[in-house]
A protein has these predicted regions:
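Charged, amphipathic alpha-helical linker segments immediately N-terminal to NTP-binding catalytic cores
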Residues: 1-29
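Pre-Walker A adenine-sensing motif
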Residues: 33-43, 135
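Heptad-repeat amphipathic alpha-helical coiled-coil interaction surface used
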Residues: 22, 26-29, 35, 463, ...
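Globular "head" domains of long coiled-coil molecular machines
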Residues: 46-287, 346
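N-terminal J-domain/J-like co-chaperone modules of DnaJ/Hsp40 proteins
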Residues: 405-517
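Short, flexible helix-adjacent loops and helix caps
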Residues: 26, 30, 73, 223, ...
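C-terminal end of P-loop GTPase domains and the immediately downstream helical coupling element
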Residues: 212, 221-223, 230-403, 407
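Charged, low-complexity interaction regions
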Residues: 26-32, 385, 502
Length: 517
């Protein structure tokens, strides 16, 4: 069999060091059973970041994926495709491939609608398919591949095992196939905490670098009231202060997934129906919008028939319907594009995109390096050979010496409140280390469109601050060590200020949304 080529070196010193380690391991294990894992680890270093969307059944995983991509790609009903791990990648053309547990991959024809939602498995049973891979031209997928997983608490042991295998939480020897996780929960259950604990297998001191928690279906927290998202934001803020979650995920964000997905795919005919509802008398609206059953089944003189109302309820949810009607009535949304923008802003999708950009996409090199290091570590443990000691030494040199991992360890220390710094210093340190996002402008608390000179000036000021802290006679040893890490970060920010691009959350918006007026 022809050996696939090793991926070429890239611009990241950390990735280059990890790539060299993987290559050396490949030479040591040449022709042995470890080679498939090492080839896979090498390829992942050059692939887009892999981010799984995980959670319990009915947490809204597929709905959130549709919102992030801005297309109705993932099936949200209980069909057979929701029982299969499905990968969504940026591609030149639309294509769906099924990868059976045995046998070669096979292309699947589009469903009756011409898309992915109703695609047929081509005679395969769901339990015969290891994964589906959907290629779709999408700017939202250009920086990260999204992986939709079955519910973690499925009554089917096999479905839960599939999700856990993809995420590397099944207790087996296989490594996670993804670099990071968006974990959806409707409320904080003990099972959510247990899952997040199992995914925390990081060589950089087991920190929460690779996990963002989302309070999904946030509109249901307030029982469909117009202020439901405000209630959800308060709940998410409370969860974010929970010491258990602080150790397991970077942040907790409220998102109304259904509302966000509908905002991204809103149609003109839906806007016209909402406008018709908004023109009805207040008394008639109050009568209809008491319960979902009344809204879909009651007779009314409003020129939106019950079947159409039921379709609107499926698309918007009760909260989304009430909010959309109010936005049209108040003149805030006078076009479909305006309503789409307003719903998207209120659904919480913007902060989630910012988090995905700042905490995942901008840290892609660190997350991918972490995944490759985990793969090498597993190989060294499973197949010890005489050269293992040398490889192990290089592995430990990278994990202990890479500044990116030093930043992660210090972020974990700050989250734990274990440093004797003032509150202001803790906030500044957390930001400079990339805790709020890895982009230079975010680290330095300056405008994202700042010039290189402005970035450099801010970096020099931060450098001087932490140099003083490192040298201050009252600083404890732990504080001095932390300040030295921050000094190194600031030095890199100063040196790189002339070449930093301004990267923001807009990069992850779907193309259709970026074109809205």
């Amino acid at each position: 069999m022809t050996r696939p080529p090793w991926p070429s070196a890239g611009p990241s010193p950390l990735l280059d060091a990890v790539r060299a380690l993987v290559h050396r391991a490949g030479q040591v294990y040449e022709g042995g059973p470890a080679m498939p894992e090492l080839y896979a680890a090498a390829r992942r270093l050059d692939d887009p970041l892999r981010v799984a969307i995980a959670g319990r059944i009915k947490a809204g995983k597929s709905t959130l994926l549709n919102a992030l991509v801005g297309q109705e790609l993932a099936a949200t009903d209980a069909g057979e495709c929701t029982r299969i791990v499905t990968w969504y990648r940026d591609g030149h053309t639309y294509r769906v491939m099924a990868y059976p547990h045995s046998g070669p991959p096979r292309p699947l024809p589009p469903g009756p609608s011409g898309g992915v939602l109703d695609v047929s498995l081509g005679g395969l049973r769901a339990d015969e398919v290891d994964r589906l891979v959907v290629d779709w031209p999408s700017a939202a997928l250009s920086r990260m591949t999204l992986v939709d997983t079955p519910g973690m608490d499925s009554l089917s042991t096999e479905l839960s095992r599939r999700a856990e295998s993809t995420l590397g939480t099944d207790g087996e020897d296989e490594q996670a196939e993804v670099d990071a996780v968006i974990y959806l929960m409707r409320h904080l259950h003990s099972s959510d905490v247990r899952f997040l604990e199992t995914f925390r297998n990081d060589p950089a001191d087991r920190g929460p670098i690779n996990t963002i928690a989302v309070l999904g279906r946030a509109d249901e927290v307030g029982h469909g009231r117009v202020d439901a998202l405000e209630s959800a934001a308060r709940v998410a803020a409370r969860y974010q202060q929970d010491p258990r979650l602080q150790a397991l995920c970077q942040t907790v964000l409220p998102v109304a997934g259904l509302l966000a997905a509908t905002a991204a795919t809103l149609r003109e005919d839906e806007f016209r129906a909402i406008t018709t509802l908004a023109q009805a008398s207040e008394a008639e609206l109050e009568r209809l919008l008491i319960t979902a059953a009344r809204f879909t089944g009651a007779e009314s003189d409003i020129a939106v028939d019950p079947a159409r109302r039921a379709a609107l309820l499926d698309r918007f949810g009760f909260f989304g319907l009430r909010l959309s009607v109010r936005l049209v009535q108040n003149g805030v949304a006078t076009t479909a594009a305006a309503l789409s923008r307003e719903l998207s802003a209120r659904a919480g999708l913007g902060p989630l995109r910012e988090a995905l950009t700042g905490r995942f996409a901008d840290r892609a090199d660190v997350l991918k390096a972490r995944s490759a290091l985990l793969a090498v570590d597993a190989v060294l443990q499973r197949w010890p050979v005489p050269a293992t000691a040398s490889l192990r030494h290089e592995y430990e040199r990278i994990t202990a010496g890479a500044h990116e991992f030093a930043e992660i360890r210090l972020l974990d220390t700050l989250r734990a409140g274990a440093l004797m710094l003032t509150d202001l210093e803790k906030t500044d340190a957390y930001r400079v280390l990339g805790g709020d996002g890895a982009a230079p402008a975010t680290r330095l608390a300056v405008d994202p469109h700042s010039s290189p000179d402005e970035l450099r000036s801010a970096a020099i000021a931060a450098l001087a601050q932490w140099q003083r802290r490192a040298e201050h006679p009252s600083s404890t040893r732990d504080v001095r060590e932390a300040a030295r890490v921050l000094v190194r970060t600031c030095e890199e920010l100063v040196l790189g200020a002339q070449s930093y691009p301004c990267v923001g959350a807009a990069d992850l918006r779907p193309a259709a949304e970026r074109m809205l007026p």
